[in-house]
């Protein structure tokens, strides 16, 4: 997979490929992450990427020419990519979209700034994505969020078993996790986790995931198709509830 982020602040974005899982994926050649400075595709000595908007109004608008110059150069070199514009008007990013994008071979992400991008650029954009209903100063952080979430789902980046056990992949929030010490400030690790009984541990984890999801994200639970472990966990939770009555 190749991901190219187009921005006027390349130094801000470069760090994403220098740390952790993504850095290892880049080093191993599983993914290629490039950061392009949009100003390199300007032609004036001031490297101008914005201008006043027609019709008047507050704020500057990003000019179309640099985006088209980049795009045409890119297509000539690599072929047509899947182009994403980070935008508060886009569809809200989630795990399902991350899975969808992880199957793409070549992604370009345009980072918006100022009051927006000249509408004509939309003729080369395939998708608009937002990371939430709030306004940021630019599209760099959303581009990094999208890249991080997508890359870790690319086969070989993270162990498949780890991905399959994550929140959202199973349609449930994660169960509580603990590490040493066994007791801290009077709070103990649940004994079932020290039992060595893998079936009991798995059942406990699923019960806790269901409880947490029902409390915090009932929408996820309502959309989930229950498997056998889910049903066993719900029966066990009901029994525990009845015993307390």
UniProtKB/Swiss-Prot annotation:
Gene Ontology BP, a term: tRNA N1-guanine methylation
Residues the entry annotates as binding S-adenosyl-L-methionine: 112, 131-136
SUPFAM superfamilies in the cross-refs: alpha/beta knot
Keyword S-adenosyl-L-methionine attached: yes
Family: Belongs to the RNA methyltransferase TrmD family.
Any GO MF annotation of the entry: tRNA (guanine(37)-N1)-methyltransferase activity
Residue ranges of the TM segments: none
Top EC group: transferase
Keywords: Cytoplasm, Methyltransferase, S-adenosyl-L-methionine, Transferase, tRNA processing
Protein name (Swiss-Prot/TrEMBL): tRNA (guanine-N(1)-)-methyltransferase
CDD domains in the record: TrmD-like (cd18080)
Intracellular or extracellular location(s): Cytoplasm
């Amino acid at each position: 997979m190749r991901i190219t982020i187009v921005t006027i602040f390349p130094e801000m974005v470069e760090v994403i490929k220098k740390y952790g899982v993504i850095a290892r994926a880049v080093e191993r050649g599983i993914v290629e992450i490039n950061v392009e400075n949009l100003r390199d595709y300007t032609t004036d000595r001031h490297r101008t990427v914005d201008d006043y908007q027609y019709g008047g109004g507050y704020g500057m608008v990003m000019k179309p020419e640099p985006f088209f110059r980049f795009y045409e150069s890119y297509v000539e070199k690599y072929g047509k990519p899947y182009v994403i514009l980070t935008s508060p008007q886009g569809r809200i990013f989630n795990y399902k979209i991350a899975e969808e994008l992880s199957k793409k071979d070549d992604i370009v992400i345009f980072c918006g700034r100022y009051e927006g991008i000249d509408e004509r650029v939309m003729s080369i954009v395939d998708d608009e994505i937002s990371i939430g209903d709030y306004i940021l100063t630019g599209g760099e952080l959303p581009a990094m969020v999208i890249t991080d979430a997508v890359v870790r789902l690319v086969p070989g980046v993270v162990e498949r078993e780890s991905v399959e056990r994550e929140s959202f992949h199973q349609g449930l929030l994660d169960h509580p996790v603990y590490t040493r010490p066994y007791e801290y400030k009077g709070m103990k690790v649940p004994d079932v986790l020290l039992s060595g009984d893998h079936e009991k541990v798995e059942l406990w984890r699923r019960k806790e995931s269901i409880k947490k999801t029902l409390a915090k994200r009932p929408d996820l639970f309502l959309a989930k198709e229950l498997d056998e472990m889910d049903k066993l966990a719900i029966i066990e939770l009901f029994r525990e509830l009845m015993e307390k009555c």
